[in-house]
Amino acid sequence: NGCFNFAKYKGTSNLQKLDDSLHLARCALNPTTMQHNKYKIVPAKSPKKVAIIGGGIGGMETALVLKQRGHNPVIFEKTDKLGGLFITASAMSFKENDKQLITWYKREVEKQGIEIRFNTEINDIGTLGGYDAIVIATGSVPRKMPIPGFEKTLTFTQLLAEKAPVGDKVLFMGGGQSSCEAAYDLILQGKHPIIVEFKDDLIADNATCLANTSYLRDAMEYHKVPVHLNCTITNIGDGVANVKNVKTGETFTVEFDNIINGIGFVPTPALGKNKAKTYKVGDCVAIGNLRTVIWRAWQVAMDI
């Protein structure tokens, strides 16, 4: 089965294209759903040894499809576990299905006998030899903002995956989906989030399911979360942030126990060059979502 997409919220369109699946649906996890004639796993004509840099969802999906096609993938993962940033994305109390997805990928990688080299960070793919192709799946890193005190912010990984103590009043710098989900998780813990968002609406994103975003917007309103739209943080002090409304010019302060960097992510830096043909998948190409990560990984694995 596929997941139906909602079309628009306050003029923000949903760009999940449906034209090649009879305008019915697309599945984030399985590109072949309802599109079996277009997307099929075809055996490779010439098996290749492929290095995959990064063991997140994109890296694991690439490895699994490559293995099914007869290639020999090897995953290089800089930490001691698979999952990448999706570990953080699935860390919230209401993300049990996402946790199960990581478990499924790990199990499938193990069942397929795919080689994994943990605690191995590749900073220059030029050092890799003996591979016919290289797939870079290194994901993204938090965006930074050049304002005084920015170093005081915590990342989503520190908040969600590492469970850093944050106190009661938690200020989110940015009101995208990640911030709203994390804020909702804090609400469930009895804490009091505050959101400062530069745009005129929360989750002003054109590639997110409206069912999810509408629920989060409603949750912020229902729980009376202070939301400051059209605003930007200009300075971060000890327990207090200076905020400016970009439309009216009004300035004010917001007190907090901790502040979270929720202004988004940027692709990881390039890793050099290699004589082997190189591909990229996931957020290191462009920041996307679970579907864009899995679909691009699937397509790249089919192109090798």
PLM ranges: what are they?
Residues 36-37, 82-86, 144-145:
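Short acidic/His/Gly/Ser-rich catalytic and metal-binding motifs that mark active-site loops
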Residues 1-47:
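Cysteine-cluster motifs in flexible loop/terminal segments that predominantly coordinate metals
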Residues 75-112, 183-233:
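Rossmann-like dinucleotide-binding cores of NAD(P)H-dependent redox enzymes
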